[in-house]
UniProtKB/Swiss-Prot annotation:
Domain of life (superkingdom): Eukaryota
Biased composition (Low complexity): 50-71, 314-350
Residues in coiled coil: none
An individual GO BP term: proteasome-mediated ubiquitin-dependent protein catabolic process
PANTHER family: FAS-ASSOCIATED PROTEIN, UBX DOMAIN-CONTAINING PROTEIN 7
Native source species: Dictyostelium discoideum (Social amoeba)
Domain UBX residue range list: 424-500
UIM domain ranges (all copies): 284-303
GO CC, alphabetical: nucleus
Identification of the protein by name: UBX domain-containing protein 7 homolog
Biased composition regions of type Acidic residues, renumbered to the chain: 362-387
Amino acid sequence: MEDPDILSNFLSITGCDDSSLATTILENNNWDVERSVDFFFTMNDPSNVKPTTSSKKTSSPPTASSSSASSEFDYNEDEFRDPIPQKMDKLVDHYYQPTQRSYQKQTNVFEAFRDFEKERGINQDKATEKQKSLSELFKPPLDILTFGTFDEIKKMAEQKKYFVLVNIQDVQEFDCQKLNRDTWSNKDLKELIGENFVFWQVNSANPEGKWFTQIYPVFKFPYIAIIDPRTGQKLQDMTGFIDAEEMAQYLVTFLSTNSFSGQIDPPPSSSSSGASKKQKKYNTEDEELELAIALSLKQEQERNSKSGSTSPLSQQQQQQQQQNNNNNNNNNSNNNNSTSTTTTTSTTTTKILGTNNKKDEKEDEDDVEEKDEDFEDDDEIEEDNYDDNYYYGETVQKEISEEEQKKVEIKQLVEKIQVTSKIGTEGDCIIQVRCPGGETLKGQFHSHDQIKNIYYYVQVKTGISNFKLFTSFPKLDLSGELMSKTLKELDLAPRAVLNMLQE
């Protein structure tokens, strides 16, 4: 409804002469004088009015249609945009390598007319026999290598369900050349790698090698790592030179604790059939020595038992001959008594012979059973119980020589040693201890194990309590406060050789 007071107030404030325009503005602003006045002066701002050629400053009043359009524009100014549509995409693409990896140096314009195949043949002809032999001696293991980019290698390993064995080499390091000459050339190691790994060897100066050393930080060459092709995770790594035997043992221990399918084959059970039983493989020289001592003691006891069984029989025969001689010197009246005594002695000797033969047969059967048990048992050498005294009407004491006595003492010392813990049998570090007698102990420890664990292992294996351990070069005495240090703190991981000095 029109309010004449509000209209007249608006006209007096604004100085507008058109009452219809004022009514329209008031209606659009709900008859609010302040808002209507602001709207009027905003519309008639002199800065928005274009200058005219006339000398008089006149402004044509806006029409009702223009005012209504502008007001509608103000009310519909707040518009909302459409929502962003959903889409599926990869956070990191499979081929995430930078473009620099595929960059190749531009060839010279003069090299376009060169025949590289012909030049290669000329250079090979000029090479001496020594150069050819050296190149063949230090050449990489091409028969087990897999060529391609790291992504291609991972795809191939994932299809074969193998782990990736990576070897990063540096031409300036001689240990890398030794690795090709001594380690990768081993036939047994080649078979192990070819059946369980995809082997990838690359130079550190190669673009692929540079990219690998950036993703997996490498500070020393040669560098060996085992990669899971599914996730790209580095499972294990090592640096420096390693011989073929230690490398094979390193890979076998890795395969025994890791499986591509996640299921590790359990060790063979002891309840398997007799045909499938195999002799235990002794890894250390001490275990082989213990087995040899036990077998030698068995053989000597068998010989002594046989010699002991003949001695009482000879005594019985001597007694029989003496009795026969005495009977011959007697009168004819005592002939009946002599014949009776001879028959009784003969029957006793036959009984003794029968019992001795039965005992020998039982002992042979026991020896066969104990040998089978030695092959089955993995941790202990069973005790052989043989009776040194046999009863043949009288007790015969077996005399033991000095050498046999020493062997018995060694056996008793070995039997007293019982390893109640797993120290020296598991871990990621291989520690070798050279004993004064020329023997070498080899044990597996963890990098966080202390030096006193090695002392305990050596004491259990050798039975010696007063000794010291020290490194070769630089010479370091591992005693005192250093016994509480770990292998990692003393830089003895993942492998080290220690010397033993008996006090």
